[in-house]
């Protein structure tokens, strides 16, 4: 069985099959998390809307895949309450937050005590092509249609075809580094 196909708890055990003939033994999860905290990453709120409802979450695991055609990916823990909503809706929007939007980041990360349904009460929200919520003050928004989802360890890697882009105000972006928000 490929490591891509294993259940999250199998991957969390620290050893799984690799493409190479020898098994892969990973570093301790706490060491890995500490090491990853040293990588600065832009902070995004990923939103979705459609027949399964609307939802969103804060993410730093977002990156470009290709510009031909424009494609990006987002990683989402499968245990997140947003995971089934996003999968059923088949669309999402990556809203890259401005440095001043830490309250929105915390709200969608579940750190504010606000119910998931009330997250959209903060900020001004619009829509582009897919109907997903677009934060008007975001530095940039990528409106995407899901083209593939791969299960890897505890997360889904969601690939999206970028159907629309909205460039926001040219402000500093919010970054997460060493377990704290910073601006770039």
Show which residues each predicted segment covers.
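Basic, polyanion-binding surface patches
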Residues: 2-184
């Amino acid at each position: 069985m490929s490591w891509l196909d294993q259940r999250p708890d199998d991957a969390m055990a620290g050893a799984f099959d690799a493409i190479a003939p020898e098994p892969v033994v990973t570093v301790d999860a706490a060491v890995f998390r500490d090491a990853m905290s040293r990588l600065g990453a832009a902070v995004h709120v990923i939103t979705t809307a459609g027949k399964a409802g609307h939802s969103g979450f804060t993410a730093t695991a977002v990156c470009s895949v290709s510009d031909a055609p424009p494609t990006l990916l987002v990683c989402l823990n499968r245990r997140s309450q947003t995971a089934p909503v996003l999968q059923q809706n088949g669309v999402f929007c990556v809203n890259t937050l401005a440095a001043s939007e830490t309250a929105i980041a915390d709200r969608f990360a579940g750190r504010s005590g606000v119910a998931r349904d009330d997250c959209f009460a903060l900020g001004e929200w619009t829509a582009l092509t897919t109907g997903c919520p677009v934060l008007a003050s975001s530095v940039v928004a990528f409106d995407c249609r899901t083209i593939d989802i791969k299960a890897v360890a505890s997360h889904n890697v969601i690939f999206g075809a970028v159907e629309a882009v909205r460039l926001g105000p040219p402000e500093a972006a919010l970054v997460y580094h060493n377990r704290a928000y910073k601006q770039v």
